[in-house]
Amino acid sequence: MYAKTFGETVCGINGEEIIVEVDISNGLPGFDIVGLPDTAVKESRERVRAALKNSGLMFPMTRITVNLAPADLRKDGSSLDLPIAVGILTAAGSLLQEEAEGKIFVGELALDGSIRQVAGVLPMILYAREHGWREIYIPQGNAAEGELVDGIDVYTPASLSELVSHLKKQERLTPLPKIQFGTETAGCGDVDFAEVRGQQVVKRALEIAAAGGHNVLMVGAPGSGKTMLARRLPTILPPMTEDEILEITKIYSIAGLLNGKKQLVLERPFRSPHHTVSASALIGGGSVPKPGEVTLSHNGVLFLDELPEFSHPGGLLRWRTNHLPQPLEDGVVTISRVQASLSFPARLILITAQNPCPCGFLGDKVHSCTCRPHEIERYRRKISGPLLDRIDIQVAVPRLEYDDLKDKTEGESSAVIRSRVVKARGVQHKRFEGSGVHCNAQMNKKQLNKYCKLEPQAEAMLGKYFAALGLSARTHDRIVKVARTIADLEGSAAIKAAHIAEAIQLRTSVQR
């Protein structure tokens, strides 16, 4: 007997339809799965066998062959347990083929027949809806993801026996209700810029970074507030749109970072990996490529604290910095394997922080630096030029003065700063509408020439400093992009000399 059911797996950040073909024939009892299954899929034989038996359902004691198509796509994870079990029941005659038709099944089977939660269900549901499927069956543990997608009926059977009863119309399940999240907005979280004392220049730099999507390097002594400032950047970024919310929630679903309580990622991500993070954990990778910290920071902030310390033995930072410029430039991480080449989104703001020297006190007003010149030079050379070239704003973070620390005057709140950022982003949204560009930092050369018109005085100033400081062509373009953002914050159509002066200061204030 032959039967066909449908399941799904995850490929990159999207679902991929899998055809599950089951053939039961005479011969010595056996259970084979073909079609490039990984270890987890091969192990489903024992899970399916035990689940059927412990659910009071018949497991055929004959030869069973399961084919997972397309055969050239590697299947990983345990989400195919459920369609395999339904396929066996259909081929054995316990279910009719029409009872399983027009439905997609996703879930891992426990040995007692219950259906366990799996990662990546949200992109699977979205794929099913986009390709015309009307029904999908997922674990109850993934119900929160099922409530996010309308236009398709999502069912959550607790067990295999409950699913069979529903398919036979003996006991009907109710599709999940849909939630409305279009009007939900995230707050500013538990931290706020109003808590930051002093550091007006750095706060201004972060406001410009948020408004234009620019990358930032902060250099300062230990305890100067670099980490505190970086953690408050997401609180001034614009609220995410519905599409951005769904996109980042998809990524977190694939990474297994959603739970029953957290069904939507409403706040922009802030990721801060330790400097011992592996290359594949940072960029993404693995034998079956999975998203790394760069992709988990999509639509948000990636913070690399103590940047030179990422260069632990093995030269890992050099490996990373040879790969980081590509996603920073393109907004996409591409990972190539023998079976396939996968792309993960990586449109983010990179915030980095470091000490000015190994001891941390070079230029400090209180402590004396104990480093030798060659030690300082070696410390700075740990960070590659290509990465530094793509950091638009490089700003010094001075030690906080006692008077600033004890000042009881509350600074501007994140909400106030965010309102200015949102207004500037609105100007950019209108400017780049339909182009695929979201903010000034992403402009290409053609857009730079079109939208960044400098007044004569601004042009003269930029030319003067370009020659005096020996700036590169890329640095020139990035200064102009930052100046464009400053002009947007001030509501100016043209880029003025004051905008160029501030952009140059933000780029060149840190001595390298």
Regions found by a protein language model. Give the residues of each.
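Basic, amphipathic alpha-helical bundle interface domains used for macromolecular binding and assembly
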Residues: A40-R45, M58-P60, N67-G77, V288-P289, ...
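Walker A/P-loop
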Residues: L217-N259, D330
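Short beta-strand elements
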Residues: I18-I24, L282, D392-V395
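Peripheral, non-AAA+ core regions of ATP-driven protein-machinery
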Residues: M1-L217, A221-T227, H476, V482, ...
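Short loop/turn elements that form and flank the Walker-type P-loop nucleotide-binding site
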Residues: F59-T62, E99-A100, G132, D150, ...
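P-loop NTPase nucleotide-binding/switch module
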Residues: E171-I208, G212, P239-T295
